[in-house]
Amino acid sequence: MFVARSIAADHKDLIHDVSFDFHGRRMATCSSDQSVKVWDKSENGNWHCTASWKTHSGSVWRVTWAHPEFGQVLASCSFDRTAAVWEEIVGESNDKLRGQSHWVKRTTLVDSRTSVTDVKFAPKHMGLMLATCSADGVVRIYEAPDVMNLSQWSLQHEISCKLSCSCISWNPSSSRAHSPMIAVGSDDSSPNIMGKVQIYEYNENTRKYAKAETLMSVSDPVHDIAFAPNLGRSFHILAVATKDVRIFTMKPLRKELSSSGGVTKFEIHTVAQFDNHNSQVWRVSWNITGTVLASSGDDGTVRLWKANYMDNWKCIGVLKGDGNPVGNSYQGFFGSSVGSAGQSLQNSVNGTPSSGRKHS
């Protein structure tokens, strides 16, 4: 059964993003009040704010967790044109703060000349890497060569997307058959510009990222984008949040059918398109197995989508902030840990501005 818990976040302005850690027991929120808050889940299921601090000198658009293999590490990005990496430090035995934790800024990434609109850590098999995207259309990929020293980050790649960028998503596949891949969404409002989702793939020969595909059917501003976790599939699934919810499959073509430059080409199909929110869709998030998608929109609901055995995607649940499910087909899906995604998305619904993220 779905239970909605209202959390008095105590942010002084709009909450733009909510992010859960790998285990789903820690949560980070960020806001236009320039702060980030960290929340821990107690044994009785209640969330308690354990840290709150001013992170930037402008609205904080996104916050995200690194894999716990690298410690308790957060990244944030802001209208102030920077991204920052934070690490939780627990007081040592000779410290007055023994056993107490606090968050320390390890680095500030200052390469962008415009608002940094999204930040995402790469899948852990790639090492400690971080991607940012900016309103000026540049995606930057950084690497921490020494995971024990988070103050040193080197800029590895700059990708010019030619369109203002609003969101990014790494392909989580760890298969050696799949090169590192990142999807970029644009919130450019011009209806004349098609292809507001671009896919970039790492080329081992050139050691650079090159554009593999453009989803020409996406012509409306994109607010969020998410590759599904890949548990042995030979193809990729990508969800896009725009004026509706869209789900694409990307099936790699055989190398001899791909371009001679070595970039993989894909057979792309729109397998689902839903306008049930009847409004802008702000967030899309997959469960851990990549079988259930949660979306949130300006209608104040979180909607859950799942494919049946015929690969037909259907809505299996509608969740409202007051905890009341709408419809009757939602039972049985919580075994796939959609609850955290739903809660994350509901918080995003409550705080995401409809004015976009380029201007404060």
From Swiss-Prot:
Matches recorded under Pfam families: WD40
WD repeat copies, ranges: 10-49, 55-96, 111-152, 160-210, 217-258, 276-315
Any GO molecular function: structural molecule activity
Entry GO terms, CC: cytosol; GATOR2 complex; kinetochore; lysosomal membrane; nuclear pore outer ring; Seh1-associated complex
InterPro entries for this protein: G-protein_beta_WD-40_rep, Sec13/Seh1_fam, WD40/YVTN_repeat-like_dom_sf, WD40_repeat_dom_sf, WD40_rpt
Keywords (A to Z) from UniProt: Cell cycle, Cell division, Centromere, Chromosome, Chromosome partition, Kinetochore, Lysosome, Membrane, Mitosis, mRNA transport, Nuclear pore complex, Nucleus, Protein transport, Repeat, Translocation, Transport, WD repeat
GO BP, one annotated term: mitotic metaphase chromosome alignment
Record has Mitochondrion as a keyword: no
Subunit structure and binding partners: Component of the Nup107-160 subcomplex of the nuclear pore complex (NPC). The Nup107-160 subcomplex includes NUP160, NUP133, NUP107, NUP98, NUP85, NUP43, NUP37, SEH1 and SEC13. Component of the GATOR2 subcomplex, composed of MIOS, SEC13, SEH1L, WDR24 and WDR59. The GATOR2 complex interacts with CASTOR1 and CASTOR2; the interaction is negatively regulated by arginine. The GATOR2 complex interacts with SESN1, SESN2 and SESN3; the interaction is negatively regulated by amino acids.
Function: Component of the Nup107-160 subcomplex of the nuclear pore complex (NPC). The Nup107-160 subcomplex is required for the assembly of a functional NPC. The Nup107-160 subcomplex is also required for normal kinetochore microtubule attachment, mitotic progression and chromosome segregation. This subunit plays a role in recruitment of the Nup107-160 subcomplex to the kinetochore. As a component of the GATOR2 complex, functions as an activator of the amino acid-sensing branch of the mTORC1 signaling pathway. The GATOR2 complex indirectly activates mTORC1 through the inhibition of the GATOR1 subcomplex. GATOR2 probably acts as an E3 ubiquitin-protein ligase toward GATOR1. In the presence of abundant amino acids, the GATOR2 complex mediates ubiquitination of the NPRL2 core component of the GATOR1 complex, leading to GATOR1 inactivation. In the absence of amino acids, GATOR2 is inhibited, activating the GATOR1 complex.
Protein name: Nucleoporin SEH1-A
Gene designation per UniProt: seh1l-a
